[in-house]
Structure formats: C-alpha cells, structure tokens
A protein has these predicted regions:
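Bacterial Sec-exported substrate-binding components of ABC uptake systems
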Residues: 2, 6-28, 36-82, 191-224, ...
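Short helix-initiation/N-cap motifs at beta->coil->alpha
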Residues: 59, 117-127, 257-269
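Structural recognition of the beta-strand scaffold that forms the well-ordered cores
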Residues: 74-75, 93-95, 138-142, 166-169, ...
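A short, structured surface patch at a secondary-structure boundary
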Residues: 76-134, 138-149, 252
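Solvent-exposed loop/turn segments at secondary-structure junctions
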Residues: 79-82, 98-101, 144-148, 172-176, ...
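Extracytoplasmic ligand-binding site segments that recognize negatively charged/polar headgroups
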Residues: 101-103, 123, 144-153, 167-182, ...
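Structured C-terminal subdomain patch of bacterial secreted/periplasmic proteins
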Residues: 174-180, 185, 198, 288-386
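Alpha-helical, coiled-coil/dimerization segments enriched in small aliphatic residues
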Residues: 237-262
Length: 386
C-alpha cells in the first residue's frame, strides 16, 4: 500500500533527504547556523514538528499531524468511520459502531478488537476521556448534507474540549469522490483514495448514462418500506431516498420529510394501496427488524401490484444498508443494485461480480459467489431476467 509523503509545504521525502544533506554541509561552514535559521519558514517549522495545516470543507484552518506521524484516527460517526477503514484500517483508533457478528464477517480483520468510543450521530455522544486516553491524534467529521453552522460549532467544541484536531468533510452524495481524495491526502493514502474515487465516479456515470433519460411517466414506481410494519418511508426530499432517485425510480412516497432527524416519515397502508407501486424495497426482518415477510404474506398488502407480481425485495444490510444508512459510499453499491433490478435491459451488469468487487475494494473482504448471492437474496436474479 503506497503512502503519500508530501507535506503542505511541498517537501517530498526525496527533496527532504536532499535538503538534509545540504543542511549538514552548510552547518560545517562558519556562520551557517544563523544563515539556515534565517531561511526557515513557518511551514518548515511545522514540518519539523510533524505538523501541517489544512483547510477543511467548512473553511476552518486545522493543524494536523503529517502523514508519517499519523497513527490513530477517530471519527464523529459511523459514516466517517467507513472512509477511514476503507482507506487504511490500521489507522483506525476505535469504533463508532457496535457491530454484530454478521456485520463483522464482512469487515476488515481486527475490527472486533477496537474499542467502541461513541458517535455524535443521532444525538449520541463520544466518550471524550476515552478519546484522549487512546491517544487519538485526529478526528474526522463527515456530513452527508451541507455543513451547517451548528455542525461547525459542535466540531469546534469537540476540538476545544479534547485538544484533538477535528477535520470537517462534505460527504454529500455527489461529493463522496472528492471527500475520499481529501481524506486520503490527509491520511497519506492518495493512490488508494483516487482508486476508490474513480471507481465511484465510474459507477455513477454508468448508471446515470443508462437511466438518466427515462421520462418520469415511464419510470418504475417504487415504495421504500421502512420500520417493523413497513409503514414509514422517505419522500424525494429526504437524503435517505437519494439512491432511488439516482437509479431512475419514481418514488411514490408523497409524504412530508420527517422532522425527527432520522427520516422515516409515517405512512398509512391506505396510501400505499392508493399509490400501488410496481416495486417495494423493504427492510429485512432478521437484521433490521423490518417488514419484508409481512408485506409478502399479509392479506392486507396482497392487493398492491408489487406484492401480486412478486416484486417485494429485501434490501441487503451487511455490513451496511446498501441504499441509505449510513448515507455514504455504501450507496454506490445500492445505486447499481436498484438500477439493475428496475432496468436490467438498460443497466445490464452481473450483480454477483459487482458485489464481490465492491466488498473487496471498500470493505477489504473477498467474498464468494454464494456469499454475494446470499446478500442479494430474492433480488437475484433480477426481476425481468428470470
């Protein structure tokens, strides 16, 4: 795994070695020390201290460790955690998730050994004493929407309370690629970050080229069934519905955006019957406590077209939900899954191979064909290709 050794001052490892040799020669001459001292810059001083300055996506100037000094990183949420471990899991200083055994099976080795230190997501808290005791050197905060003044205040407070630099990153859907490049540069993982960014850009461009020109009246209608009874959903305005829109679906959920901060707007069964979607994507009943089996088997749902046609699909959830939570890079696999499922003739890919590729690149987990098919569940093979 290659690392980037360039500092903010523009000194590479090679030029630093050359500089060191020249400095040693100069110091052997009378008066050289004062000459050298007079030439040192603020950036140069920071470099020798193992520090550099970056301007984060909130416009904040943050002093952080240079890549050669960076060993332990934490994050304010599971969303940011995925960026860190997908780039360099050995730099992860703890966990913002409490993973199940099923989720751990698809994650880098050693994840189960890391301490859970909390998360600010969903109004949660981070254990600040543990954060400092574990010698965390840097914290990433990644936002799935535009960074707000409240977000900035929260990160400033965290930085002030702990003395640990906090870097804020815009991780909104179309900025995921740039977020990877920015974080990768800070972590000394520019080559790997570029590989992931290019991969995501390729997925997005290919899917949009395949489904982006479908007129609204010809789009497949879809209902996203959340919660234990399937009677919560996400309207188009919700960030949790973004994957469906990008994949060319016509989201039928004509409900207000939830003000809870968690999504999941309430829906009545009568409304779903009236919308009569062609496809339903539901949470699974085992991992997420969803209503996929209820929807498939209950007489109350049987009048809906998606149920009658056998087009109720369970969203894969291990180690993360493919379409929405967290709203991060996992959505790019969901983008492929939904586009291929709704429009197999337009977006004709082998989802078994795509799942294997994604898990290998992003999660460091090489899975078999059977494991990929197990994750895909009843959506493999896609409807329309049976």
């Amino acid at each position: 795994m290659q690392t980037n050794q360039q500092s903010a001052g523009g000194i590479t490892r090679r030029s630093f070695i050359k500089f060191g040799g020249a400095a040693a020669l100069t110091l052997a001459l009378p008066g050289a020390l004062s000459t050298l001292t007079g030439c040192r810059s603020e950036a140069g001083d920071a470099f020798f201290r193992g520090e550099r300055k970056v301007v984060d996506h909130a416009g904040r100037e943050v002093v952080i460790p240079t890549t050669d000094k960076l060993e332990r990183i934490y994050f304010t949420s599971g969303l940011a955690e995925i960026y860190v471990f997908s780039l360099a899991p050995e730099l992860q200083g703890g966990c913002a998730y409490q993973f199940t055994d099923e989720e751990l099976a698809y994650l880098p080795e050693g994840m189960d050994k890391l301490k859970y230190m909390g998360s600010l997501a969903g109004g949660g808290e981070i254990d600040l004493e543990m954060l400092m005791a574990e010698d965390i050197q840097l914290v990433f905060d990644v936002s799935a929407v535009a960074i707000s003044s409240s977000d900035i205040s929260t990160c400033n407070n965290l930085q002030d309370q702990t003395g640990i630099p906090v870097v804020m990153v815009d991780g909104s859907f179309t900025n995921v690629m740039n977020a990877y490049r920015f974080i990768g540069d800070i972590m000394g993982q520019t080559a790997r970050a570029e590989k992931i960014a290019a991969y995501c850009e390729g997925i997005y461009n290919d899917v949009r080229a395949a489904v982006g020109d479908i007129p609204d009246e010809q789009k497949v209608s879809l209902y996203y069934a959340e919660g234990p009874f399937g009677l919560a959903s996400e309207p188009n305005e919700s960030l949790h519905a973004r994957t469906f829109a990008e994949a060319g679906a016509r989201n039928v959920a004509a409900v207000p955006v939830s003000t809870s901060g968690y999504g999941m707007s309430s829906v009545s069964l009568e409304s779903v019957i009236q919308w009569d979607p062609e496809v339903i994507i539901a949470w699974d009943d085992v991992i997420r406590g969803g209503a996929d089996e209820i929807i498939r088997t209950s007489p109350d749902w049987s009048v809906i077209r998606a149920v009658r046609d056998g087009r109720v699909y369970t969203m894969p959830n291990a180690p993360f939900a493919w379409c929405d939570r967290p709203p991060g890079v996992n959505r790019f696999l969901g983008l492929q899954w939904v586009a291929n499922m709704l429009y197999p003739d337009r977006y004709d890919v082998d989802m078994v191979e795509e799942v294997k590729r994604f898990y290998s690149l992003l999660y460091w987990c090489d899975i078999t064909d059977d494991q990929a098919k197990d994750l895909l569940g009843n959506s493999y093979p896609p409807y329309g290709k049976r």
